[in-house]
Design a protein with these regions (language model features):
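Glyoxalase I/VOC metalloenzyme domain signal
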Residues: 6, 46-48, 117-124
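Residue-level recognition of conserved beta-strand positions in structured domain cores
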Residues: 41, 80-82, 105, 115-116
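Short acidic-glycine-tyrosine-enriched beta hairpin
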Residues: 80-99
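Ligand-binding loop in jelly-roll beta-barrel domains
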Residues: 97-123
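A short, N-terminal "cap"/entry segment at the start of jelly-roll beta-barrel domains
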Residues: 1-43, 51
Length: 124
């Protein structure tokens, strides 16, 4: 009798073929669901600002989604209503709490980041 070999299911996905895409002025948010987790890739062009380019779509001037992510390219700022402003740069791992905040691209280079937490609720 030949012993049975367990089957291992490996799933590979790419952001080039996302499960969902959310478009807005000067930006796009691509979502891939894998292993029960939704991961987002944000790509924002210079001049992008959450309160201007996403806010009107969701009916708010501030984002209220919690984020855990990694900056791949470009720079952005995240600002809270109490005056705190944080700069996000390539290689930065970031956690932004669900308190109201605005965000914008800094400089002339597109900003790209991965979002591991909050992606399914972002820009919705």
């Amino acid at each position: 009798m030949t012993p049975s070999i367990p089957t291992v299911a490996v799933v590979l996905k790419r952001f080039e073929t996302p499960d969902e895409v959310r478009h807005f002025t000067r930006g796009v948010f691509e979502l891939v669901t894998i292993g029960g987790m939704t991961i987002g890739r944000a790509t924002y062009q210079p001049g992008w600002r959450w309160s201007v380019d996403v806010g009107p779509t969701v009916g708010s001037d501030r984002c209220r989604v919690e984020h855990l992510g990694l900056v791949l390219q470009g720079r952005a700022a995240a600002a809270f209503d109490d005056g705190r402003v944080w700069e996000l740069t390539p290689g930065s791992l970031f956690h932004i709490p669900a308190e109201p905040h605005d965000s914008w691209v800094i400089g002339d280079e597109p900003y790209v980041s991965l979002h591991f937490l909050g992606a399914s609720h972002y820009a919705k």
